[in-house]
Swiss-Prot record:
Gene label: rplR
GO molecular-function term, one example from the UniProt record: 5S rRNA binding
Function: This is one of the proteins that bind and probably mediate the attachment of the 5S RNA into the large ribosomal subunit, where it forms part of the central protuberance.
Name of this protein: Large ribosomal subunit protein uL18
Annotated GO CC locations: cytosolic large ribosomal subunit
Entry keyword set: Ribonucleoprotein, Ribosomal protein, RNA-binding, rRNA-binding
Length: 123
């Protein structure tokens, strides 16, 4: 994966970090990749098998489960982690490789990981 990303700025740094991470991280059928995507308002978590190129399970703050959710964005991110762990365990997945998607491992990204660990996933 050759990505020529030049310049400075938050989005450029995000793309550079993501490209660097993806060179080393890949999901397998035994240990798929837990991808975390963060926007200003929402969090999305997907468990992906990279050998087949398919999403096995996903959870997001856009789902109906979060329709009446009141709390901080960090609390919502933790709930997304718990929800993805519940769905992954139902699909027979117990261990995943964590892909922070170029985001720094703090705040909402770390909350998703903590929620997934509390839900029973091995990261």
């Amino acid at each position: 994966m050759s990505v020529a990303i030049l310049g400075k700025g938050k989005k450029v740094a995000l793309k550079r970090r993501h490209a660097r991470i993806r060179k080393r991280i890949s999901g397998t059928p035994e240990r798929p990749r837990l991808v975390v995507t963060r926007s200003n308002r929402h969090m999305v978590a997907q468990v992906v098998d990279d050998t087949k190129g398919i999403t096995l399970v996903s959870a997001s703050t856009l789902q109906a489960d979060f329709a009446g959710f009141e709390g901080t964005k960090t609390e919502a991110a933790k709930k997304v982690g718990e929800l993805i762990a519940e769905k992954a365990k139902a699909a027979g997945i117990t261990a995943v490789v964590f892909d922070r998607g170029g985001n720094k491992y703090t705040g909402r990204v770390a909350a998703v990981a903590d929620g997934a660990r509390e839900g029973g996933l091995a990261l």
